[in-house]
């Protein structure tokens, strides 16, 4: 069931859980993503997530500024590679496939990059609570995880406001 995304500047996006929940929500609401995970994608059991493509969220680093929190985010969108067989006969069902090969790698890379573009574009322009101030670096992969997954990884820094409330702790 899709979750509602509310444009709420009152959400404290400097909290780790709120950043994770934001990306989990937009990934679950994307029409092409079938399952969403968190953490190191090397540990994902591909038998536990039979629905593809899958989205994965990982916060790799965090730094505190004077009034900001900056998260280094890695989003991965991956799909399971499938072998393709050219079963058409030349006389009845000839097709011109510009990138035909033994698997669907080009299709997976095209689709997963488009999904990452959707997710990062929405994050850049649709949310008032944080900003992506630098370029988003996307890297394709195919044999990186030794589990038949292929797709793209996007890395970027997400900056949020952090008021660092000093009234929360009293020292004696």
Feature-to-residue mapping (PLM):
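Small/polar-rich, solvent-exposed N-terminal microdomains that initiate assembly or binding
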Residues: 1-68
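Extracellular/virion structural assembly segments
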Residues: 2-20, 67-69, 77-120
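A generic structural signal for ordered alpha-helices
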Residues: 35, 53, 90-93, 97, ...
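Acidic-leaning, charged glycine-interspersed low-complexity segments
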Residues: 47-52, 103-159
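Oligomerization/assembly interface segments of phage tail-like spikes and tubes
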Residues: 67-82, 148-162
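Mixed-charge, glycine-accented linear interaction segment located at domain edges/termini
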Residues: 170-172
């Amino acid at each position: 069931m899709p979750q509602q995304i509310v444009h709420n500047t009152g959400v404290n996006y400097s909290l780790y859980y709120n950043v994770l929940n934001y990306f989990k929500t937009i990934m679950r609401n994307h029409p092409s993503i079938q399952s969403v995970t968190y953490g190191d994608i090397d540990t994902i059991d591909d038998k536990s997530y039979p629905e593809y493509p899958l989205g994965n969220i990982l916060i790799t680093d965090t730094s505190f500024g004077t009034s900001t929190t900056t998260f280094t985010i890695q989003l991965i969108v991956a799909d399971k590679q499938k072998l393709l067989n050219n079963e058409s006969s030349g006389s009845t069902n000839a097709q011109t496939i510009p990138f035909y090969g033994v698997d669907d790698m080009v299709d997976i890379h095209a689709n997963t990059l488009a999904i990452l573009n959707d997710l990062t574009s929405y994050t850049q322009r649709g949310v008032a609570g944080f900003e992506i101030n630098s370029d988003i670096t996307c890297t394709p992969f195919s044999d990186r995880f030794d589990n038949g997954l292929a797709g793209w990884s996007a890395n970027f820094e997400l900056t949020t406001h952090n008021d660092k409330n000093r009234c929360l702790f009293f020292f004696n």
